[in-house]
Amino acid sequence: MRCDRLWRDARLATMAGNGLGIVEDGVVAASEGRILYAGPAADAPAFDPDRAETLDGRWITPGLIDCHTHLVHAGDRAREFELRLAGASYEEIARAGGGIVSTMRATRDADEARLVELALPRLDALIAEGATTVEVKSGYGLTVADELKMLRAARRLGEARPVGIRATLLGAHALPPEYAGDADGYVDLVCREMIPAAAREGLADAVDAFCEGIGFTPAQTQRVFDAARAAGLPVKLHAEQLSNLHGAKLAAEAGALSADHLEHLDADGIAAMARAGTVATLLPGAYYFVRETKLPPVDGLRAAGVPIAIATDCNPGTSPLSSLLLTMNMGATLFRLTVDECLAGVTRNAARALGLQAEIGTLEPGKSCDLAIWDIERPAELVYRIGFNPLHTRIWKGL
């Protein structure tokens, strides 16, 4: 059987099914950017490849997926980091005009080209560790023009680098100063102008919101979900990070792809997510960076069978992190996730959190040939080692 590329003498973690899907003597064959075969060499058809590589026992996993980032932004929040170290809370900083609003000012001042220029090094850091798909949110423009500018910048990242980009409109991220005291008026803008414009221009793959005391109420979040659904866009939600407003349950009832953060998630929210198949995206970098003490209810999520993804949450204020390898280690050490859960969290469950489970996230025939090839002895090394990048080769769409 003819194929474009063949990788042999490899060990595979296909991530298919519920475990790692380990194959000790494996082969991956691809043609036209799609996987033809991924499995035991003994069961492989007789392939006639245009290009074959012998991997000498290296491991192949699916390309890694970062399903929650805020890569596109200008400015930094190093000064706020110092304030937090001195005892100021995230809420206190936000209410004093810092936080998201300070990044908003810098992002509004930057043009699209500058935003791309600033985001590329962050994206490159993820790519260097095997990422083949990255979600990128807006949310620092908070006007129609500036949110669309951010989404265009996100699309341009995918043109500048060999990586899949999923752009998420996060217009309901914070209340801009010009709408102080009029959150409902700002939500009107998001629902009536921002979401329709992003959908009309094909700039957004999903819509997100920040349901929190310093963000938007459940009723306002529901309006955002309704507008997204009317525009034909799936939804996601920042929920239960700082308090429990029952946002995860609201998201699940709206059929959300994922609910993210979830430190304050309760049993009702877990049950709703399990019923809906909504992915729990945990963000250990933010938990670590803002020195949270309340852990997400991992045992409850496990018991209910809720799929768990993990992501960097790369952003300037609460998780200036651009390493999925470190994120996996944090997921294990801080949240007590297993190695299998961490690896699933940046592959098959991350794909599901983006609605891409039929396309990426596992090594299976018909899926995009997105691979990460590693110089390791066992998959646990990807979670165990700190400050270590054993990536040998990254393949995106067969190239």
Curated annotation (Swiss-Prot):
Fe(3+) binds at H68, H70, H238, D313. It holds the Pfam family Amidohydro_1. Binds 1 zinc or iron ion per subunit. Gene3D superfamilies: Metal-dependent hydrolases, Urease, subunit C, domain 1. Pathway: Amino-acid degradation; L-histidine degradation into L-glutamate; N-formimidoyl-L-glutamate from L-histidine: step 3/3. GO terms for molecular function: imidazolonepropionase activity; iron ion binding; zinc ion binding. InterPro entries: Amidohydro-rel (IPR006680), HutI (IPR005920), Metal-dep_hydrolase_composite (IPR011059), Metal_Hydrolase (IPR032466). GO terms for biological process: L-histidine catabolic process to glutamate and formamide; L-histidine catabolic process to glutamate and formate. 4-imidazolone-5-propanoate binds at R77, Y140, H173, Q241, T318. The keyword Thylakoid does not apply. GO terms for cellular component: cytoplasm. Keywords: Cytoplasm, Histidine metabolism, Hydrolase, Iron, Metal-binding, Zinc. Belongs to the metallo-dependent hydrolases superfamily. HutI family. This is Imidazolonepropionase. It comes from Rhizorhabdus wittichii (strain DSM 6014 / CCUG 31198 / JCM 15750 / NBRC 105917 / EY 4224 / RW1) (Sphingomonas wittichii). The lineage of its organism: Bacteria, Pseudomonadati, Pseudomonadota, Alphaproteobacteria, Sphingomonadales. The gene is hutI.
